[in-house]
């Protein structure tokens, strides 16, 4: 039942993407910074960071429109995306992007203003036919990596939002702040591999269970698919750290 609800939420988020897209825009935050404006995407990114301290990457697993799009694509390519150095690409992108935002803000002039609906039409992102060119371009950028490389490849390799939540969840874990995370009892594991097959991120959950690393995996989106699939209840949600 939990996975049906989760997937329904992702589909709703995906369908609402033409309305919400500018609130996740990595470009508009730079444009707003050049005008000393705190825009909607700035507020969203800061909120993601703060929430991740207590909820990990739950946003990615339950509410992210880009995640919903990629999980639909996984029906065409359900192979796990390769890891290693590729996972670091998004951090390089993030550092360069954040540096650009900061430099742009410092060099800009004028009083600071707050406009959550910056560059939207009464809060709606895509309201004109011409804007759909941008929308479908973004859709292609989200879809192609997952089509070529496998499960949620865009999340793994290129997502500019993921580092906010990785940093936030890491802070929560290091400081032992109560946080939603997945813990495993490896003695219960029978190495059936069902957790690996069910993971929408294509993670090697079985190995993480054997090495007791489920709680510290920064690529885990706390979706709970592995928990629901495990026949021995070896995986569970926890709030308190051991």
Question: Which stretches of residues belong to each language-model region?
Answer:
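Non-ligating segments of multi-cofactor redox enzymes
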Residues: 1-209, 213, 218-221, 225-242
């Amino acid at each position: 039942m939990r996975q049906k609800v989760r997937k329904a939420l992702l589909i709703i988020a995906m369908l609402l993407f033409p309305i919400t897209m500018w609130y996740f825009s990595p470009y508009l935050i730079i444009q707003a910074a050049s005008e000393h404006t705190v825009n909607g995407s700035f507020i969203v990114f800061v909120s993601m960071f703060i929430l991740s301290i207590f909820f990990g990457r739950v946003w990615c697993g339950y509410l992210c429109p880009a995640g919903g799009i990629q999980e639909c694509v996984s029906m065409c390519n359900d192979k796990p995306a390769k890891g290693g150095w590729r996972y670091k690409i998004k951090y390089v992108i993030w550092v360069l992007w954040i540096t650009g935002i900061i430099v742009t803000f410092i060099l800009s002039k004028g009083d600071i203003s707050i406009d959550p609906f910056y560059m939207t039409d009464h809060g709606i992102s895509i309201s004109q036919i011409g804007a759909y060119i941008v929308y479908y371009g973004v859709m292609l950028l989200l879809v192609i990596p997952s089509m070529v490389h496998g499960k949620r490849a865009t999340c793994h390799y290129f997502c500019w939002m993921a580092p906010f939540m990785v940093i936030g969840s890491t802070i929560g874990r290091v400081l032992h702040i109560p946080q939603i995370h997945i813990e495993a009892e490896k003695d219960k594991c029978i190495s059936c591999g069902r957790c690996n097959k069910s993971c929408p991120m294509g993670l090697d959950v079985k190995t993480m269970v054997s090495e007791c690393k489920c709680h510290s995996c920064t690529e885990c989106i706390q979706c709970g698919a592995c928990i629901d699939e495990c026949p021995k209840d070896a995986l569970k949600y926890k709030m308190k750290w051991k």
